[in-house]
C-alpha cells in the first residue's frame, strides 16, 4: 500500500536528516534501517533513493547559511564579499580530490563494500579514531579558529579526507570533521566547513546518481515520486534542527560520544550478522 511506503519514506527522511550531519554515516544508516524495514521498490530505485534524498538535507544548509554564503547579499561590505568568494574557492578546491579519486571508483566500492559487515567495520574503526583524536587534542589549541584564516592548502587536505567516505559506513561529515581537526582547525570551523563542502559534493553526487538512474532506462512512477518527495522534505525539515544542534553542541563538547556510538552500533551489527548467518 502507498500509505505504508510513504510512512517508511517519512521515517527514512528522519534518519537521513539526523545522520547526514552527525559523524555517524547517513548512507550506512539508511542501508541498515532498510535491512529491517525495506521499501517495496526496485533495487535500482532504492539505491538512487538513498543518495538523492540527501538533496533535502543539503537545502537546509543553503537556507540556514544563505546570507553567509551569498556574495551578492545586500549590505555586505567589500571585505565580506571578498571573504565569501574566498570561502567558495576553498570549497571548490576541497572538492578536487573527490572528483579525481572518489568518483572513478565509486561504483567499485559500492559493489564491494555496500554490505553490513564492511559498514560495521567502518563504523567501529572510525569510532576509535574519533576517540583517539579527541584524546590527542584534549590539551592542544586549534591553529585555525575562523574559516577566513583557513588556507587553501588546508581546504585541499580536508577534501582528501573526504575521499575516505567512499567506503560505506565511514560518514562524509565524519571524515571531513576528523580531517579538519587532525590538521588543526577548531571543532566549529570543522563543522561549518563540512556543511559548506556538502553543497557541491552532494548536489553533484546526487545529480549523477539520478542521471545514471534514468540513463539506465528507469522511470519514476507517481508513487515513487511521492516517496522521494516525502523523504526529501522530511530530511530537509529535520536537518534544519540537527544543523543548529550540532553547531551549538561543538562549542561546548567534543565528538567522543559519537565515536562511542559508532563502536556500539558497529559491534551490534556484527553480532546481528553472526546470529543470522551462523545460527
From Swiss-Prot:
Keyword Transit peptide appears in the UniProt entry: no
Keyword field contains Transmembrane: yes
Catalysed reactions, semicolon-separated: di-trans,octa-cis-undecaprenyl diphosphate + H2O = di-trans,octa-cis-undecaprenyl phosphate + phosphate + H(+)
Keywords, comma-separated and alphabetical: Antibiotic resistance, Cell membrane, Cell shape, Cell wall biogenesis/degradation, Hydrolase, Membrane, Peptidoglycan synthesis, Transmembrane, Transmembrane helix
Enzyme Commission number, as recorded: 3.6.1.27
Pfam families: BacA
Molecular function via GO: undecaprenyl-diphosphatase activity
Coiled coil: none
Compartments in which it is found: Cell membrane
Residue ranges of the TM segments: 45-65, 85-105, 113-133, 188-208, 226-246, 255-275
InterPro entries recorded: UppP
Membrane topology: Multi-pass membrane protein
Single GO cellular component term: plasma membrane
One biological process term in Gene Ontology: cell wall organization
Function (record text): Catalyzes the dephosphorylation of undecaprenyl diphosphate (UPP). Confers resistance to bacitracin.
Note: Bacitracin is thought to be involved in the inhibition of peptidoglycan synthesis by sequestering undecaprenyl diphosphate, thereby reducing the pool of lipid carrier available.
HAMAP family listed in its UniProt record: Undec_diphosphatase
Family that this chain belongs to: Belongs to the UppP family.
Protein name, UniProt field: Undecaprenyl-diphosphatase
Native source organism of the sequence: Streptococcus agalactiae serotype V (strain ATCC BAA-611 / 2603 V/R)
Lineage of producing organism: Bacteria, Bacillati, Bacillota, Bacilli, Lactobacillales
Gene, per the UniProt record: uppP
